[in-house]
Each structure stands twice: as structure tokens, then as C-alpha cells.
């Protein structure tokens, strides 16, 4: 869930729109400590089917729209699950390994259009075994860098922040748990408009629709 490019099918164009980076907060650093493939993982055939939908099965694709590889990682999603370099430059096996970690964290909602099209469920994720070689993932720590402003600018910023906090205070919020994704949360809380509406309501905090963090607080869209 951020510049890279994806295969230009209707599915990938939609994924590109939902994964656009929105300014709202500055991330000075993000480090995940240890990653592990799930004890149960989807079969290679399942990943081949997903890749066929996402990129016509082209594991080394980079067409310039912010997505890479067979299952169309964004660079931020790839790095969040421990990937190095660019996804399309990694082997198919490495891409599948990182995709398994992302699927374990986010569910099939990390690929909302193609997973629904293919009818993928948790049963597909439990179809094959892989060895866990690293530590379990933990929530990402983030820090914000604030540029110093003049006294007048600071006063205006404080007023804007107070107004934003007042709006957030009136809205219902939820806290991300392990295994959550925008797709699963939208279903759980019956969000009108689905995961895309939940993403739109949290653009300031969620830069990539495929990547949310354990402990992160999200605002539920108001009906």
C-alpha cells in the first residue's frame, strides 16, 4: 500500500489510484524488526493465479506507475515486509516469500480487486507450508519532523490543528490489530463505500492502502 509502475490493466489502474501517496505527515524513519513467512501459506499455484491477474504473470515487470513485480508491490509495501532493492529485480521465489508475509499481515485485502475476482479466502492462504526463518513482525515505529515556523505561522498551525482534532474527536476511531487490513476493517465495521471509503477518510495517516500498522488509529467514515 507508496515511484514505481504497475501493469496497465484495469485492475492495476485501480490499485494505483488507491495507493497514491498523500501529504499529511512526514515520516522521518520506519523500521520493522524481523519478518517471518507465515507457518501456513498459499501454494505457488495461488500466487501464479494472482500474478496472472495483477501483471499477466510477468514477475520482472516495471512499467512505471509505482508498482513492481508479479503481484505488483509498491516500494513501501515491499520494504515494509523486509524486501531489499526493487520487487521486480528479485526472484519469483523471493517475491512470493515477501507476498506471503504481506498476506499474513494484511490478508488478501492487500490485493483487493484481484483477490475478489479470484475468490481468494483464508483457506487459500492455509493451503501450503513454508518454513519460518526470521522473527515475527512488530509494529513500525515512526517519527515526525516539524519545520520551525514564524510566530504567526505557528499560531495559524495551532488553530488548524485544534480544528482538526475537534473533528477527529467527534468521529469514531478504531485501532489496527495484527492481521487487519483496510479491506477486513471495512467489512468488520460495515463501512459504507468499503475499504476505499476507509482509505479516503485516513489519507493523512495512510500513504499506501496496502500498508497499515499494528496500533495505528484510524477514523471510521461518518455516514
Curated annotation (Swiss-Prot):
**Induction / repression:** RNA is abundant in early lag phase, decreases by early mid-log phase and is undetectable by stationary phase (48 hours growth). Protein expression is slower; detectable by 5 hours, accumulating during early mid-exponential phase and then gradually disappearing by 50 hours growth (late stationary phase) (at protein level).
PROSITE patterns attached here? LYSM
The record ties this protein, via CDD domains, to: LysM (cd00118), RPF (cd13925)
How its function is modulated: the record gives: Activity on the artificial substrate MUF tri-NAG is inhibited by 2-nitrophenylthiocyanates (NPT) compounds.
Q: Where is this region: Not required for resuscitation activity?
A: 119-223
- Keywords in alphabetical order, please: Hydrolase, Secreted, Signal
Q: Where is the LysM domain?
A: 172-220
Q: Which domain of life is it from?
A: Bacteria
Q: What happens when the gene is disrupted?
A: Essential, it cannot be disrupted.
Class of the enzyme per the UniProt entry, highest EC level: hydrolase
**What cellular component GO annotations does this protein have?**
cell surface; extracellular region
Taken from the record, one Pfam family name reads LysM
- Where does the signal peptide begin and end? 1-41
Q: Which family does the record claim for this protein?
A: Belongs to the transglycosylase family. Rpf subfamily.
Query: What is the protein's name according to its record?
Result: Resuscitation-promoting factor Rpf
Species of origin? Micrococcus luteus (Micrococcus lysodeikticus)
The organism's lineage?
Bacteria, Bacillati, Actinomycetota, Actinomycetes, Micrococcales
* Record gene name: rpf
Amino acid at each position: 500500500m507508496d515511484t514505481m509502475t504497475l501493469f496497465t490493466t484495469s485492475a492495476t489502474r485501480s490499485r494505483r489510484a488507491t495507493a497514491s501517496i498523500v501529504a499529511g505527515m512526514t515520516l522521518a524513519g520506519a523500521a520493522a524488526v524481523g519478518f517471518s513467512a507465515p507457518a501456513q501459506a498459499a501454494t505457488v499455484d495461488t500466487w501464479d493465479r494472482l500474478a496472472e491477474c495483477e501483471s499477466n504473470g510477468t514477475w520482472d515487470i516495471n512499467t512505471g506507475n509505482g508498482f513492481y513485480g508479479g503481484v505488483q508491490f509498491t516500494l513501501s509495501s515491499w520494504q515494509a515486509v523486509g524486501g531489499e532493492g526493487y520487487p521486480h529485480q528479485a526472484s519469483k521465489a523471493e517475491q512470493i516469500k515477501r507476498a506471503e508475509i504481506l498476506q499474513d499481515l494484511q490478508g488478501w485485502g492487500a490485493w483487493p480487486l484481484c483477490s475478489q475476482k479470484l475468490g481468494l479466502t483464508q483457506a487459500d492462504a492455509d493451503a501450503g507450508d513454508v518454513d519460518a526463518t526470521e522473527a515475527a513482525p512488530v509494529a513500525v515505529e515512526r517519527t515526525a519532523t516539524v519545520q520551525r515556523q514564524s510566530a504567526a505561522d505557528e499560531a495559524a498551525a495551532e488553530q488548524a490543528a485544534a480544528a482538526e482534532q475537534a473533528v477527529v474527536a467527534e468521529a469514531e476511531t478504531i485501532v489496527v490489530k495484527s492481521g487487519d487490513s483496510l479491506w477486513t476493517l471495512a467489512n468488520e465495521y460495515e463501512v459504507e463505500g468499503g475499504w476505499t471509503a476507509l482509505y479516503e477518510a485516513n489519507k493523512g495517516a495512510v500513504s499506501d492502502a496496502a500498508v497499515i500498522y499494528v496500533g495505528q488509529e484510524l477514523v471510521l467514515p461518518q455516514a
